[in-house]
Amino acid sequence: GKDNLLDLCIEKFGKVALFHRLDRDTSGLCLLTRPGEINAYLDKLFKQRRVVKEYLALVSSQKEIDAEGVIKTRLRPHPRRRDQMVVVGKGGFYAESRYEVLGESEGKKLIRIWPITGRSHQLRVQMSYLGVPIIGDRIYGGGEKTGLRLMLHAHKIELPAADGFETRSFSAPLGEDFKQLIPTSLINLLP
């Protein structure tokens, strides 16, 4: 059987293009298209960094961080672990994200994150770098003993109007397993 979304879509629809993919353990919205004019439009928007991607993350409150901010780092693959990225002072690939802490309770913070760039593992590495690893992240320090999946969710994508296409916004609801981990006092803060 097929074990990933791309294979399932190809089987059902034929040729598709993948414009917004997720790390294996991240839940939420993917953006796939069938061949056509939309692909040139999306390609242009992504290259110009005009697509607004919004994620929700539940992180460990190990450290105090600003209520909102911008994280700018340089990332490169780990020299020995190919499945891992590391922050470096020089070289690597520029990675930038904006974040907002929606609330904090019971040792957890609910954070909304907007990646500006789209590097592999970017949000996971950057949250860990800030000292607030994403819960369930076995690679970057938030899930060694929890047994939980990664609490990172691609919540929303906004595509601006351009080249004859209208503004579009897509969202994916949080899964029940994610919602159950959010402290009751923070549930009403969800966007």
Language model region names:
Residues 102, 114, 160-162:
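A generic structural motif
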Residues 120, 124-191:
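Pseudouridine synthases involved in rRNA/tRNA modification
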Residues 36, 116-117:
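Loop/turn elements at beta-strand to alpha-helix junctions within RNA-recognition modules
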Residues 1-96, 103-106, 151, 165, ...:
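RNA pseudouridine synthases
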Residues 89, 111, 135-137:
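Thr-Gly-centered strand-to-loop micro-motif
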Residues 60-62, 113-116:
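A structural micro-motif recognizing beta-strand termini
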Residues 106, 111-114:
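Short histidine-centered loop motifs in beta-beta connectors
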